C-alpha cells in the first residue's frame, strides 16, 4: 500500500481491519471483486518511506474463510457420499460455514469417515482421495478455490 496522503497516520492500521477492493491486471479482462467476500488484514508487516512524501506499508491479508479454516477443527464422524460430506464441511454452521458458492461434482458410494481434529480444508483433502465421480467414473478429485467460489470436482470434468 502506497500512502502519500498520510491516511495510515490518521487511520492507523493495526490488523483485523476488513479490506474491500477490486483486483485488476492490464493483461486480463475482468477483475476479482473482494467487495462481496471481504479480506481481513492480519498483520501490518513493514512501514518505510519510499520518498519524501510517500510511505509504503506491507499488509498481510487473507480471506475470512481462510482465517476461519485455521481456527476451526473437526473431530466428527460422517456418513454419506464424499460430495455430500464436502458440502456439509464447507456450508455447515459447525464447520466452515462459508457464504461463497460451492460447485460440486457428485460422487458415488456411501462412505464412513472419522475426521481426527483436522481443519476443514485438511479434512476435505483427506477424504477426496476416496471419491469416485458419479458422472465420469473418475477416481481423481481436486478441491480448489477461485474468485467465483469453491470447486470439488474430478480431473475429468
Feature locations, PLM:
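Short, intrinsically disordered, mixed-charge
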Residues: 13-15, 91, 95, 129, ...
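Second-shell loop/turn segments in exported
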Residues: 70-79, 109-115
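Short beta-strand-centered interaction patches in the first periplasmic/extracellular domains
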Residues: 56-58, 63-65, 103-157
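Short secondary-structure capping/junction motifs at helix and strand boundaries
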Residues: 29-35, 96-101, 135-141
